[in-house]
Design a protein with these regions (language model features):
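Conserved C-terminal structural/oligomerization subdomain of aldehyde/semialdehyde dehydrogenase
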Residues: 89-243
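ALDH superfamily catalytic-core signature
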Residues: 1-109, 132, 172, 240-241
Length: 243
């Protein structure tokens, strides 16, 4: 929940979908709602909750949700509903304040727009799975992610997933925090970028190491320069013998 609440999900490492064991949907929705609303009991008109950057981006997020619902997805809002106009406006994103409450999208499929591009908003698709191999296959089927988040206490299962997938960075049992750790490099791999900054690696990445070669006054390299003659032939013959 924290990863989608920070800046209303408008960060490059906000989670774009959740892979959830089938049968835990209701439990997850309740836990997500509790976690999302603990620091932010109300999203509408809350100055501590970020707005969507532009009206155009807000319209894009609305379209994503409408398309998903039209294709059979179920949307659960983290803002309480009701008969009041304020609640209704908040659900679809207030056009004046451009705030949109976090929303879970169940029954999301790969054919939906929100599963085909970076969401960059407070919408979180949920994909149910039956086997751990389904998790690995789903992650590896898409572009290599900038961040991957694992939640669970079984270290063997965790290590199995992390060893079989590729991502820019990982946070275990939380989100976003590998970005903030001063001793960890941050960066992507493949489609999510290349190279890293932060920490010692960042200093090297963002510094230029100027190469300087100083030729000594007496150098054997001059014997290898043209024009080539008998002396060069003798040198090459010796090199062939010893090498």
């Amino acid at each position: 929940a924290h990863g989608k609440r920070v800046n209303a999900g408008q960060t490059c490492i906000a989670p774009d979908y959740v892979l959830l064991p089938r049968g835990q949907e209701a439990e997850f929705a309740e836990a997500f709602r509790t976690a999302a609303r603990r620091p932010c009991p109300r999203f509408a008109g809350n100055p501590d909750y970020a707005a969507i950057l532009t009206k155009r981006h807000l319209a894009r997020l609305r379209q994503m949700l409408r398309q998903a619902q039209g294709m059979g997805a179920h949307v659960e809002w983290m803002e309480d509903g009701g008969a009041g106009q304020e609640s209704a406006d908040m659900a679809w994103g207030d056009a004046v304040e451009r705030q949109m409450a976090p929303a879970l999208v169940f029954n999301a499929t790969s054919q939906m727009q929100l599963m085909q591009e970076e969401i960059f908003g407070p919408i979180l698709p949920v994909i149910s799975y039956d086997r751990l191999d389904d998790v690995v296959s789903a992650i590896n089927a898409g572009p290599r992610p900038l961040a991957l988040y694992w939640f669970g206490r079984d270290e063997k299962v965790r290590d199995a997933v992390l060893s079989r997938t590729i991502s820019g960075g990982v946070t275990v049992n939380d989100t976003l925090l590998h970005f903030a750790h001063e001793n960890l490099p941050f960066g992507g791999v493949g489609d999510s970028g290349w190279g890293a900054y932060h920490s010692e690696q960042g200093f090297a990445r963002l510094s230029h190491q100027k190469a300087v070669f100083v030729q000594s006054r007496w150098s054997g390299a001059s014997m290898l320069y043209p024009p080539y003659g008998a002396r060069f032939d003798r040198i090459m013959e010796l090199m062939r013998r010893w090498l």
